[in-house]
Amino acid sequence: MAQKGNIGVTTENIFPVIKKFLYSDHEIFLREMVSNAVDATQKLKTLAERGDFKGELGDLTVRVSLDTDKGTLTISDRGIGMTEEEINKYINQIAFSGVTDFLDKYKDNANAIIGHFGLGFYSSFMVSKKVDIITRSYKEGAKAIKWSCDGSPEFEIEDAEKDDRGSDIVLHIDDDCKEFLEKQKIEELLNKYCKFMAVPVAFGKKTEWKDGKQQETDEDNIINNVEPLWTKTPSTLKDEDYKSFYRTLYPMQDEPLFWIHLNVDYPFNLTGILYFPRIKSNIELQRNKIQLYCNQVFVTDQVEGIVPEFLTLLHGVIDSPDIPLNVSRSYLQSDANVKKISKYITKKVADRLAAIFKENRKDYEEKWDDLKIFIHYGMLSQDDFYDRAKDFALLKDVDGKYFTYEEYQTLIKDNQTDKEGNLVYLYANDKEGEYSYIEAAKAKGYSVLLLDGQLDNPMVSMLEQKLEKTRFSRVDADIVDRLIQKEDKKESELAKDEKDNLEQTFRSQLPKMEKTEFYVDVQALGDQTLPVLITQSEYMRRMKEASKFQAGMAFYAQMPDTFNLVLNSDHPLIKQVLEDGKTACATELQPVESELKGLEARLAALHQSQNGKKQEEISQEEKDDVKNTESALEEQRTKKNNIIATYAAGNKVVHQLIDLALLQNGMLKGAALDSFLKRSVDLIK
């Protein structure tokens, strides 16, 4: 005779609440159902091993089956089953209080509700309008029981027919969840959540191509590997085993660089395998590739807070029963066990890298370009990892040679120490684009590093802070003699007027480029140095680069790129431009410059006469005199600049020198490049 009753909850109806708060994550019901079946099976195996179960274990496969006609999804096991008393204890009594407060607290975290109070079974009501449990305990003399509930607090228990031990959970799928009656959808979820569960899980039969179509065979379609690689002893495994397992996890990925097998049982339980993949150009696309398991049951691939931030770029599997999986992420990040696990993983990764570096440096160097993004990310984000990694982090020069930090300091300290005692690390970001600057530095006997990685620029800033009396400078940040200044710079012998005229000659002909500004500077660089070159301020360039990644630096992002056009006043070509300008502009410039000198003298005298007077003591006539003189000065300066600009516009050498400097920096393109080529031919004729 059927028995009816109410499920023991302190709220009127738990099921609408479950549906409301868990609907966004409703697919996990299948994980919970299959996981429960696996648990029941493993408990039976444990009882058998202890001698508490004397019967035959037989086939222990957990079976998942669909009946689209009846609209049901069934999960069956041959585990320990349940008696009527156990159903009352584990199914009918949801023993907790303060449910409303709890739901308010965790309403944004679906997983916090399931599991926290053992509600795994009740996740089935997220997709079901009715759930039946047909079960028979393994205990001798136990009878089969059927429990039914339609999602209200009421349930019904009655005798059932079931010859074998175990449980069948029959889910009558809700009308708005019909996708869970599709074979492809169930296969997808089983592969996602159950592919490494510890008991075989079957879904249908395997198929083969026969008589021109796919036909079912008699062989079960087992969807999981009950002994995944991370559960095995590392000493029994070969490299190919690890590579094969990686291909199983990530079929479309390139072969990993290497891997770390985690296996610890104290002070916490943790197993797993972490792979170092070959990182492509976009770091963000690499994240969320570590899969987190609890006793071989997939939980999530959102592992922030469990795995150190920089190691979220790794691939692989972590399995631990000691991580509280069904709580909020903020709780995870403050959990003592999680912190220990995070530190342990960091240490294991550092130890593995150090061992590879020590045992096979050649192989390590060959993999460095792929490895460095992990190492740099870790050094930038965690001080404890920096302290470990500084001994195996490498620097690579433009010739492809690798050095540890200590080795490189020893290499350059004699020749690359400036007059202030700073060790200067010269570097290039683009070996081809900065070639002439690199060669100029090498001609001085300097070593140049190649820093072309995604995180090399922030690494430079960090190393300047970590290493004492150390400065990094890109090879195009200044002329080579000033990159590492060993003595006071030589001043140009040109008079101020000559420098001003020379600067205006070139400034007037510089191209107008969007969000780009040029400044002209005259320096005495020696007659063997190039006549013209372009440099870019190390500080401003770094600030603009940092603004792409760091919040609060939008000011620098909006600023134009600034470049310095450096004129070598010692070079014959620059001297020629200056002398030609004097000759060509003498007649026009003489009266203008004479007028300028007179106006400058007059303005100086006016300022002198007003010196020491309060503003109200200066007459309007005196103020007007100053204003008119300043206006006349500006007019004459503009006139002078126009005369020089007219001369410069017709001087092919000026244009050729500017274009050569732009070409050297990859800034000469399109019509400007075409004009340069034609002019070059004319000059050769």
Model-derived features with residue positions:
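GHKL (Bergerat-fold) ATPase N-terminal catalytic module, capturing the glycine-rich phosphate-binding loop
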Residues: M1-F180, E188, K195, K343, ...
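GHKL/Bergerat-fold ATPase module in large chromosome/replication-associated machines
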Residues: I113, V131-E154, D174-K178, Q184-K685
